[in-house]
Amino acid sequence: MDEFHRYGKEDSSWQQCFLYPLFFQEDLYAIYHDHYLDGSSSSESMEHLSSNDQFSFLTVKRLIGQIRQQNNSIVFFLNCDPNPLVDRNKSFYYESVLEGLTLVLEVPFSIRSKYSVEGMNEWKSFRSIHSIFPFLEDKFPHSNYILDTRIPYSIHPEILVRTFRRWIRDAPSLHPLRSVLYKYRNSPDNLQKSIIIDPRVNTRFLLFLWNHYVYGCESILVPLLKRSFHPRSLSHGSFPDQTHFDRKIKHIIRNYRRNSLKSIWSLKDPRIHYVRYAERSIIAIKGTHLLVKKCRYHLPIFRQFYFHLWSEPYRVCSHQLSKNCSSSLGYFLRVRMKPLLVRTKMLDELFITDLITDEFDPIVPIVPIIGLLAREKLCDISGRPISKLYWTSLTDDDILDRFDRIWKNIFHYYSGSLDRDGLYRIKYILSLSCAKTLACKHKSTIRVVRKELGPELFKKYFSKEREFDFPAFSSKAAARSQRERIWHSDIPQINPLANSWQKIQDLKS
């Protein structure tokens, strides 16, 4: 593989490299074999693989040969054998072939993504999730509309093969991919006759297909949007007198609409920003309502022709940030006006100016979070704490750790919101539910539990000092954090409650 990477650096015709011989390299399947044995949680499968015949690379090569011959007796995604041990053994070999197929196809994809994406109109598709919230905080105040879209999961298998064929000219390496995709498409369980790629299914093969497909879509869509809505214009940036600048522009347009409409339109400087997490993408636009209507019209057409699917179930929702809120990433996203008092001293005179700026203000969805806590049997639908009977068989430390972990995850994820009064209501619900669970376990009352365990025990687990696990945080830093927005570095592990609430919002929309 290092040889292929070297080849990709030196020669621009790396598309002509032959990947098919890599399928017969035993190292690929040995890596998956060791990974399967190390990560398997089933002792029965471990005993079966160790007691049965040893892992045979010859069997893997024969399976690859049968794929090339289009042998219909091989069904990758169906369990046809009544013997569970034989069926598990077959499934293991088929998964190893898929793993090898994925590893081989990742070689040119990694080369292409590393050396080609840098030149696409200064757009880079690989960004860490750590930068999503700071990106929204930086770009949303300078936008007035957002478009919220969802990328479809259902994809025709031939579309996937064609996207690979654009940059892989080795036809034999595409035959195994086409065979696997079409066998799954024609299976009796698949009624839609298309590939359902769910990135939440943690398989290397599906994740690779999803990432590659979304990468191909974004590599066309985002540069197209950049070129369409970024004209050469006089950009006034985000100066304090931007409001007065816009008033002057409106005055000029009103007086000279007939003569210089095109030149004045270039001064308006429409801007567009794109961000995506999982299957949801957000397009922030600074422009007129007509521009937003054009985007809403062209985006479904682009998706319909590129995805070859009817895009009505994945409609584009537009929101005006100054009036409406958009639900995304577990927040209600909005932009609010923030007054600023500026004092300017010139010689002996002091001038005071009131300015109004836009500020990104994410809102914590307290009511939906309480509803999700009610589904987890931590409170009722009105927010009244109840005991978690399922946890009464655990030790006291385990119960306290679980409640504390829930509170810590919620607070860390929603620490980007400045309005935290609702968060402390969630803290009260969790702490009282924890006390009721301990009281139910010991068959006593909450007062007795607090008296026996002591109030310091609850302060230890639900204290504000534990909200910051960094020794560099002092008391002054903790006090300052109440007035400042903090995006913690562990937010890539998105809270399950936020994900569940987002699914409910998607079903409603």
Curated annotation (Swiss-Prot):
The record's GO molecular-function terms, alphabetically, read: RNA binding
- Asked whether the keyword tRNA processing is assigned, the reply is yes
Query: In its keyword annotation, does this UniProt entry include Plastid?
Result: yes
Q: Which GO terms describe its cellular component?
A: chloroplast
Q: Which GO terms describe its biological process?
A: mRNA processing; RNA splicing; tRNA processing
Q: Which UniProt keywords apply?
A: Chloroplast, mRNA processing, Plastid, RNA-binding, tRNA processing
Protein name according to UniProt? Maturase K
Q: Which InterPro entries match?
A: Domain_X, Maturase_MatK, Maturase_MatK_N
Where, subcellularly, is it found?
Plastid, Chloroplast
Its job? Usually encoded in the trnK tRNA gene intron. Probably assists in splicing its own and other chloroplast group II introns.
Classification from the root reads:
Eukaryota, Viridiplantae, Streptophyta, Embryophyta, Tracheophyta
UniProt lists the family membership as follows: Belongs to the intron maturase 2 family. MatK subfamily.
Disulfide cross-links: none
Supply the PANTHER family for this chain: MATURASE K
A Pfam family that this protein carries is: MatK_N
